[in-house]
Swiss-Prot record:
InterPro entries on file: Ankyrin_rpt (IPR002110), Ankyrin_rpt-contain_sf (IPR036770)
Signal peptide: none
Protein name (Swiss-Prot/TrEMBL): Putative ankyrin repeat protein RBE_1215
ANK repeats: 22-52, 59-88
Keywords: ANK repeat, Repeat
SUPFAM superfamilies: Ankyrin repeat
Length: 120
């Protein structure tokens, strides 16, 4: 992940504060599927990206809900300590539930497509 950071920042000249089309940023990526506590700490400790409640527009994911969704306990624990979080709100859980529903719909649509293809 740090090598990717070097590539993006130094070789391509893309700022770390760059946002994707859906509003996600490097902190969202670091808390998502790849889950890199090292990257999260780098972004937060250097005050590059510190808003753990910033929503992406596609699913409404925040870095915190992504870390919870992808089971990155180390990142969640770091956020709890760094930002003095005492509990996860129902609103955060709703975002996670919406993500699960969306993933299920995608899986169901893919499964249905392949079932239809095998009937032809």
């Amino acid at each position: 992940m740090i090598n990717l950071l070097r590539l993006v920042v130094y070789e391509k000249g893309i700022p770390l504060t760059y946002e994707e089309w859906d509003g996600g940023n490097a902190l969202h990526v670091a808390c998502g599927a790849g889950g890199s506590l090292k990257m999260v700490k780098f972004l937060v400790e250097n005050n590059i990206l510190t808003n753990i409640h910033k929503k992406s527009e596609k699913f409404g994911d925040t870095p915190l809900t992504l870390a919870i969704s992808y089971d990155h306990h180390d990142i969640v624990d770091y956020f709890k300590q760094k930002f003095n979080i005492t509990s996860v709100t129902l609103k955060d859980l709703d975002v996670i539930i919406d993500r699960v529903k969306a993933n299920y719909r995608r899986y169901y649509n893919i499964k249905k497509y392949y079932e239809n293809q095998s009937k032809k």
